[in-house]
């Protein structure tokens, strides 16, 4: 089998295509959630906390000197990214929960004979 043909079969396998679609949709979903958090949730949260803009929250570690910019710890952006993560994780949890609910439960394998029944059968065979 040629290398190209083998790669084509691999790339067109259902799992790879499904994963590619998931990555693309996940990227788009991430942008939507980032916009939701940055443009809707954080401004409302800022108003509730007295007009704080979380994007501007930072701790200056070293002041700017001449042409060198200040060294800052931007914890406001970190808080915003934590909100992004929580919303995305919760949405994924809900989707997986819904998918698992839709999946049909796997049929149980038929139960075989018990250990006692097998031992009795072996005993009977040895008696013959």
Curated annotation (Swiss-Prot):
The chain crosses the membrane at residues 10-30, 76-96. It holds the Pfam family MscL. It is found in: Cell inner membrane. The keyword Transport applies. Keywords: Cell inner membrane, Cell membrane, Ion channel, Ion transport, Membrane, Transmembrane, Transmembrane helix, Transport. Homopentamer. HAMAP family: MscL (MF_00115). This is Large-conductance mechanosensitive channel.
């Amino acid at each position: 089998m040629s290398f190209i043909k083998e790669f084509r079969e691999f790339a067109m396998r259902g799992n790879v295509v499904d994963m590619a679609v998931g990555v693309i949709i996940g990227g788009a979903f991430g942008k939507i959630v980032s916009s939701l958090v940055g443009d809707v949730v954080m401004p409302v949260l800022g108003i509730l906390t007295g007009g704080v803009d979380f994007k501007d929250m930072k701790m200056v570690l070293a002041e700017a000197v001449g042409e060198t910019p200040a060294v800052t710890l931007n914890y406001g952006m970190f808080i915003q990214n934590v909100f992004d993560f929580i919303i995305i994780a919760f949405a994924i949890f809900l989707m997986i929960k819904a998918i698992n609910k839709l999946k049909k439960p796997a049929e149980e394998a038929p139960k075989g004979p018990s250990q006692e029944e097998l031992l009795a059968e072996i005993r009977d065979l040895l008696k013959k």
